[in-house]
Amino acid sequence: MKKEIIIVTISLGNDGAERILTELARQWVHDGHHITVIQTSPNRYGNEYALEEGIEQIQIHTTSSNKVIRFIQEIKELIKILKTRPNATCLSFLSASSFILAISSWFVKNRIVFSERNNPRKVPIGWHQQALRNFAFRFADALVFQTEDARSYFPESVQKRGVIIPNPINGKLPPPIEGEREKTIVTACRLHPQKNLPMMINAFSML
């Protein structure tokens, strides 16, 4: 059955959540679903990830230099778009876009799904950002977590609407090499404590 799915994001900048949403959008459009990606601030963090052909793209461009007014403009434009697609399921992978979508959900009939991509105890940084994230989660019809530990951080009212779905893997990865090969391990990521590279190094040292 063909479904209409709308992914709301700040931009398609070079980050993990954006990579995951582009992977999922690619697979879903291949499965025959109608996929739309809405960027609320397309120029803020760049557009590092390209979307598959067949995925509809909508960019919301605001005109004010005032941050609060820009925020209101983004919500108004998003509501206007969603009202034309009441049967679409709306997804968000970032706390900032989840908050915008949560406010918009008061005025539309769409099913809302939020995905927690990080350790909720540490990300987003700052109590006020975490408060906005927790506020947004109250308005989700369903929530996606990567681990049971992440889901257990939230109150029961959130946990009972949550499901555990691990990260997807790119289907275009090359097949593993058979036979003898060098014992060399390569990783590519930001040098940031969140990536916990020491744990990875220690884990591979045990092999």
Task: Give names to the regions the model predicted.
Residues 149, 168:
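Carbohydrate-associated surface elements
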Residues 74, 92-98, 116:
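Short His-centered aromatic/hydrophobic patch
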Residues 15-23, 183, 192-206:
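A conserved mid-protein helix/loop that constitutes part of the nucleotide-sugar donor-binding site
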Residues 65-66, 99, 108-127, 142:
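A short, histidine- and acid-enriched strand-loop-helix "catalytic/donor-clamping" loop
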Residues 1-3, 172-184, 191:
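Nucleotide-sugar donor-binding and catalytic loop/hinge architecture
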Residues 8-9, 146, 187-194:
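Short hydrophobic "strand-cap" motifs at the C-terminus of beta-strands
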Residues 2, 7-69, 153-155:
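N-terminal strand-loop element at the rim of the active site
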Residues 79, 107, 126-144:
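Membrane-proximal helix-turn-helix segments that form the acceptor-binding/catalytic region
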